[in-house]
Amino acid sequence: MTNQLTTNEGQPWADNQHSQTAGQRGPVLIQDYQLLEKLAHFNRERIPERVVHAKGAGAKGYFKVTKDMSAYTKAAVFSGVGKKTPLITRFSQVAGEAGYPDTYRDVRGFAVKFYTEEGNYDIVGNNTPVFFVNDPLKFPDFIHSQKRDPRTHARSQDMQWDFWSLSPESVHQVTILMSDRGIPASYRMMHGFGSHTFKWVNAQGEQFWVKYHFKTNQGIHNLSNELADELAGKDTDYLQNDLFDAIETGDYPSWTVAVQLVPYEDGLNYPQDIFDVTKVISQKDYPLIEIGQMVLDENPTNNFEDIQELAFSPANLVPGIEASPDKLLQGRLFGYKDAERYRLGANYEQLPVNRPKVPVHNYERDGAMAQNQATGVNYEPNSQDGPTEVPAAKIHGDQLSGTTGNFSADPDYYSAAGKLYRLLSADEQTRLIENIRMNLGQVTKPEIQIREVKQFYQADPEYGRRVATSVKLRFSSV
């Protein structure tokens, strides 16, 4: 049955093809309120795009527990073999705008929102286990360097490599980005990582450090530079279409979800800083433990409502899962929610896709587009049967000491990148060097190239020498 056309107020709409005019050839009448409403709404259809991760796609699905983890965390989402929790995901680029080609070389966002019985739990990571910077103070500058030149409004290799060459902590992530995995062939065919270290707490108060890994069950597949360039010209939404079409035809992508668990004290005494997001925890020391499967089996029914209005935050934690001292994570706990307040409004949590599946009871009221919490009391303490605190949900703090100040982090930013380079096959190393040449070779200032080659050399001398040769630098100048 065809629905009746109406205005936004529900009134029947007689003619949506012709404006009201003074005669057949006369001017449009200001009394045509339906025309005015249509134009006014059109002017307000767009919302600010995400300041990062603007281009992306998503899908709905579920997480199924395959190993009960209640010995390590009291979070209900990870307890009980066979338990299913609905979720929604979003995969994205980092730097490109909303219309940017999907096959541009970039880190990919990998975000998951679990609708648990204890509220929403978000894992907001990437398709790489590390990141470019480890201090939130540097994050805005990093993003500025990856976006458009304020004068030319063009992407700038000089800006990107200038920042990287002056930020030694970035060399590990840059190596991953310039490797084969810098251009995934499909969102379905890439791994995901929580990136940061988090804390798990069990019902007895025992604490563990945890890192999340999402291992694609479709296998890792990447694009060559040539094919990526070809697809960018033919289908700018290639990865988005690939994900949608696969799910639409019943080819549901899935990931094996695993964790690295580190006993609390062991983490504090680990040879490297496990709270530095530019580094990984060796799987030889702490092997992966499979905990479940993530399956995506439903496409968005309305992309704007399901994906554009979708909001993630690392601060969306549930009892049994807590933040760690990771500096970049600490900054993200604020930054993401503040970004959504700007992009979607003060009450973005009330949008259907962000609304938890459990009732919400608190003392926050009003604001733009608010659906208030009935007639309940709006202050605390009170004696009016308002919602009460839940002591069992308290966090388990860490013992902290030290002098306040601005501190640099671990100076060893090179060994991990060197190990990664040496783990690559000869063919993978050759493609890595060629990918760097294609990008670093476009830099117009030799001093930037020299600084970056020095970074690669400190990671591995052969690595540095090969990059220097590829961009035609005399190694003596390095």
Swiss-Prot record:
<keyword id="KW-0349">Heme</keyword>
<dbReference type="Pfam" id="PF00199">
    <property type="entry name" value="Catalase"/>
</dbReference>
<dbReference type="InterPro" id="IPR024711">
    <property type="entry name" value="Catalase_clade1/3"/>
</dbReference>
<comment type="function">
    <text>Decomposes hydrogen peroxide into water and oxygen; serves to protect cells from the toxic effects of hydrogen peroxide.</text>
</comment>
<keyword id="KW-0479">Metal-binding</keyword>
<feature type="binding site" description="axial binding residue">
    <location>
        <position position="336"/>
    </location>
    <ligand>
        <name>heme</name>
    </ligand>
</feature>
<dbReference type="GO" id="GO:0042744">
    <property type="term" value="P:hydrogen peroxide catabolic process"/>
</dbReference>
<dbReference type="InterPro" id="IPR002226">
    <property type="entry name" value="Catalase_haem_BS"/>
</dbReference>
<feature type="region of interest" description="Disordered">
    <location>
        <begin position="1"/>
        <end position="23"/>
    </location>
</feature>
<dbReference type="GO" id="GO:0042542">
    <property type="term" value="P:response to hydrogen peroxide"/>
</dbReference>
<dbReference type="InterPro" id="IPR020835">
    <property type="entry name" value="Catalase_sf"/>
</dbReference>
<dbReference type="InterPro" id="IPR018028">
    <property type="entry name" value="Catalase"/>
</dbReference>
<protein>
    <recommendedName>
        <fullName>Catalase</fullName>
        <ecNumber>1.11.1.6</ecNumber>
    </recommendedName>
</protein>
<keyword id="KW-0963">Cytoplasm</keyword>
<keyword id="KW-0408">Iron</keyword>
<feature type="active site">
    <location>
        <position position="126"/>
    </location>
</feature>
<feature type="active site">
    <location>
        <position position="53"/>
    </location>
</feature>
<keyword id="KW-0560">Oxidoreductase</keyword>
<dbReference type="GO" id="GO:0005737">
    <property type="term" value="C:cytoplasm"/>
</dbReference>
<dbReference type="Pfam" id="PF06628">
    <property type="entry name" value="Catalase-rel"/>
</dbReference>
<dbReference type="GO" id="GO:0004096">
    <property type="term" value="F:catalase activity"/>
</dbReference>
<dbReference type="InterPro" id="IPR024708">
    <property type="entry name" value="Catalase_AS"/>
</dbReference>
<keyword id="KW-0575">Peroxidase</keyword>
<comment type="similarity">
    <text>Belongs to the catalase family.</text>
</comment>
<dbReference type="GO" id="GO:0046872">
    <property type="term" value="F:metal ion binding"/>
</dbReference>
<dbReference type="InterPro" id="IPR011614">
    <property type="entry name" value="Catalase_core"/>
</dbReference>
<keyword id="KW-0376">Hydrogen peroxide</keyword>
<dbReference type="InterPro" id="IPR010582">
    <property type="entry name" value="Catalase_immune_responsive"/>
</dbReference>
<dbReference type="InterPro" id="IPR040333">
    <property type="entry name" value="Catalase_3"/>
</dbReference>
<dbReference type="GO" id="GO:0020037">
    <property type="term" value="F:heme binding"/>
</dbReference>
